[in-house]
Amino acid sequence: MLVIFYLGDGCLHCIEQLKAFSPVTQDFEAAGISLVAISLDTAEGLNKSLTTSGIEGGYPFPLLSDRSMKIFKAYRAFDDFENMPLHGTFLIDEEGMIRWQDISYQPFEDTAFLLKEAQRLLNQTKAPILAKEGEG
């Protein structure tokens, strides 16, 4: 799963990011990767995003609201010093492990790189880091 944390409909860079991921959503899904975007917008703001996106039918992935910023903070897409949310993009495997992340003041928009890297990371075999005592 690819989780995108964005600041909301009022953030032009965020909207550019969502529009960058929209046409390649099917490519990610073909690789077994679903997308979801989490915003600080209210439910009304999310509905506005869908109608003003300029994309027929709205975005091809769910938009969720995190007004309390609990999820932003749990993923550390939050600057404690500045007391403000950050842009975040996370690749999460089937076991819930974060395999790749980008947290920044700018949204991540290199969809081609991320698709290729996601396929590489998710297709790696999972080997134990250290052998258990008495093994090997």
Map each language-model feature to its residues:
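Chalcogenol-based redox active-site neighborhoods
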Residues: 1-136
